[in-house]
């Protein structure tokens, strides 16, 4: 899972793309929906359009761009390797070429964008509908079963035909619909809209009795579905292999791992906020929200933008106790087992720092749900004086820790700490995470050794560049 979002630069350089394997079979105009994309460009009056391709479809980029320029007369720019996840629209790269719109090809997380108009062309991957229906009947022999059918976006085009084959046999089957863009809030009772999918239930309580059937390969999308709807049994059909199965992912074990990371976040003193997207709408709002949350919790935060995170990059920030990744819903669940410090989601940081938010069994991966006015937003409770705070003990270290919130309007502590106040437990109230980290290091830098080191005059140093200093040339001659 880590390789889907974080990547090593050497791995990218060594990767070999096979054009024959990457190129889809059949008519390219139909696969890439050239007519629909051309209508989008003409109707919008765009003169410059960015075409974003994932690595798997990059072999066809030149042909598709030439075809689009031929039918629209607009100037096309191909966007290849994206700064973050390929499922997200790379608005930053599109703005570099002054593009008026983006056509995003391939799998997508369907996160709404901030600025540019976007058209999603998923690519019509082939699906054996007959085989899929046969597998569905094997997995659900009871004809009265309540099943919600979800699919990867690349197979959404075939869901209508699958529905025709199954709706007469299964009267309680429900097919989800792919929704692109930032759709308005649900207005119909019983409507569920999440992960860019929408389906309708006759009654809200009916969802508790449903099973989920996913059409697509194993990946981040399926993992997000299973963690979010963790109370429902999942089955899947992989079109590449033609086999179906009941998903055996131990959701409880995965959730226990995530809750362990919440406990690590409670113990952290320094939080690194990783910017994992620059195009998803609301990312600036959630960054500000996380800054306020961390500050109210008495922790220190730093905002880091390192592109695609990998262990080597994040290992440079030793002072950071835990990272929180602000990314789209699919890329938020980054496996941090290979990293030196844990990586949590904004929802997990809220569980750790907001006393008013409790674990209810519902897991959230979309950070926009946490913002004011959203469905899952919970206000921070009033600040509690340190003397009245209930002490808490870490379940990991066994040490005492502070869990009360600080007053957001309280003035910053003075720079001088000659006089420090003590609370009722006679403990010092001020603590510096930086000083604590420095004290724990085995090597703290060069010591001055005042009065012990002889004073020497400045001498002439070496000249040149590291590859060939001037004195090295004289020595060789």
Swiss-Prot record:
<comment type="pathway">
    <text>Protein modification; peptidyl-diphthamide biosynthesis.</text>
</comment>
<dbReference type="InterPro" id="IPR010014">
    <property type="entry name" value="DHP2"/>
</dbReference>
<feature type="binding site">
    <location>
        <position position="328"/>
    </location>
    <ligand>
        <name>[4Fe-4S] cluster</name>
    </ligand>
</feature>
<keyword id="KW-0479">Metal-binding</keyword>
<comment type="function">
    <text>Required for the first step of diphthamide biosynthesis, a post-translational modification of histidine which occurs in elongation factor 2. DPH1 and DPH2 transfer a 3-amino-3-carboxypropyl (ACP) group from S-adenosyl-L-methionine (SAM) to a histidine residue, the reaction is assisted by a reduction system comprising DPH3 and a NADH-dependent reductase. Facilitates the reduction of the catalytic iron-sulfur cluster found in the DPH1 subunit.</text>
</comment>
<keyword id="KW-0408">Iron</keyword>
<dbReference type="InterPro" id="IPR042263">
    <property type="entry name" value="DPH1/DPH2_1"/>
</dbReference>
<dbReference type="Pfam" id="PF01866">
    <property type="entry name" value="Diphthamide_syn"/>
</dbReference>
<keyword id="KW-0411">Iron-sulfur</keyword>
<dbReference type="GO" id="GO:0051539">
    <property type="term" value="F:4 iron, 4 sulfur cluster binding"/>
</dbReference>
<dbReference type="GO" id="GO:0017183">
    <property type="term" value="P:protein histidyl modification to diphthamide"/>
</dbReference>
<feature type="binding site">
    <location>
        <position position="88"/>
    </location>
    <ligand>
        <name>[4Fe-4S] cluster</name>
    </ligand>
</feature>
<dbReference type="InterPro" id="IPR042265">
    <property type="entry name" value="DPH1/DPH2_3"/>
</dbReference>
<dbReference type="GO" id="GO:0090560">
    <property type="term" value="F:2-(3-amino-3-carboxypropyl)histidine synthase activity"/>
</dbReference>
<dbReference type="GO" id="GO:0120513">
    <property type="term" value="C:2-(3-amino-3-carboxypropyl)histidine synthase complex"/>
</dbReference>
<protein>
    <recommendedName>
        <fullName>2-(3-amino-3-carboxypropyl)histidine synthase subunit 2</fullName>
    </recommendedName>
</protein>
<feature type="binding site">
    <location>
        <position position="109"/>
    </location>
    <ligand>
        <name>[4Fe-4S] cluster</name>
    </ligand>
</feature>
<comment type="similarity">
    <text>Belongs to the DPH1/DPH2 family. DPH2 subfamily.</text>
</comment>
<comment type="subunit">
    <text>Component of the 2-(3-amino-3-carboxypropyl)histidine synthase complex composed of DPH1, DPH2, DPH3 and a NADH-dependent reductase.</text>
</comment>
<dbReference type="GO" id="GO:0046872">
    <property type="term" value="F:metal ion binding"/>
</dbReference>
<dbReference type="InterPro" id="IPR016435">
    <property type="entry name" value="DPH1/DPH2"/>
</dbReference>
């Amino acid at each position: 899972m880590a390789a889907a979002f974080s990547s090593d630069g050497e791995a990218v350089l060594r990767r070999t793309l096979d054009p024959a394997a990457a190129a889809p079979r059949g008519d390219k105009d139909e696969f890439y929906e050239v007519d629909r994309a051309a209508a989008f460009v003409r109707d919008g009056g765009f003169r410059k359009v960015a075409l974003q391709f994932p690595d798997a479809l990059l072999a066809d980029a030149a042909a598709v761009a030439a075809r689009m320029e031929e039918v629209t007369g607009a100037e096309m720019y191909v966007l290849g390797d994206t700064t973050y996840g390929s499922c997200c629209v790379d608005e930053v790269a599109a703005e570099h070429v002054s593009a008026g719109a983006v056509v995003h090809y391939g799998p997508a997380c369907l996160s709404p964008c901030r600025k540019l108009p976007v058209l999603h062309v998923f690519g019509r991957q082939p699906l054996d509908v007959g085989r899929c229906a046969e597998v569905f009947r094997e997995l659900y022999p009871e004809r009265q079963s309540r099943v919600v059918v979800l699919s990867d976006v690349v197979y959404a085009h075939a869901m209508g035909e699958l529905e025709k084959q199954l709706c007469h046999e299964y009267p309680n089957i429900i097919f989800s619909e792919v929704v692109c863009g930032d759709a308005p809030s649900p207005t119909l009772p019983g409507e569920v809209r999440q992960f860019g999918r929408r389906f309708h239930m006759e009654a809200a309580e009916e969802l508790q009795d449903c099973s989920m059937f996913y059409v697509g390969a194993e990946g981040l999308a399926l993992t997000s579905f299973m963690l979010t709807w963790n109370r429902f049994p999942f089955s899947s059909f992989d079109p590449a292999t033609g086999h179906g199965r009941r998903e055996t992912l131990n959701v409880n074990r995965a959730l226990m791992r995530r809750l362990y990371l919440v406990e690590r976040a409670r113990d952290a003193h320094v939080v690194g906020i990783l910017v994992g997207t620059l195009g998803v709408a609301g990312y600036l709002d959630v960054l500000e929200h996380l800054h306020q949350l961390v500050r109210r919790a008495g922790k220190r935060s730093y905002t880091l933008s390192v592109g695609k995170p990998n262990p080597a990059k994040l290992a440079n920030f030793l002072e950071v106790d835990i990272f929180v990744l602000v990314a789209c819903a699919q890329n938020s669940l980054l496996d941090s087992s290979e990293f030196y410090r844990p990586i949590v989601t904004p929802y997990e940081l809220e569980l750790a720092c907001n006393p008013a938010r409790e674990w209810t069994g519902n897991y959230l991966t979309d950070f926009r749900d946490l913002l004011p006015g959203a469905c899952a937003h919970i206000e921070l409770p009033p600040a509690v004086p340190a003397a009245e705070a209930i002490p808490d003990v870490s379940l990991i270290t066994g040490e005492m820790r502070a869990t009360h919130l600080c007053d957001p309007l309280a003035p910053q502590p003075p720079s001088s700490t000659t006089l420090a106040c003590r609370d009722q437990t006679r403990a010092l109230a001020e603590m510096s995470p930086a000083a604590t980290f420095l004290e724990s290091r085995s090597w703290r830098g060069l010591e001055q050794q005042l009065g012990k080191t002889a004073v020497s005059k400045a001498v002439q140093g070496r000249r040149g560049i590291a590859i060939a200093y001037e004195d090295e040339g004289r020595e060789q001659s």
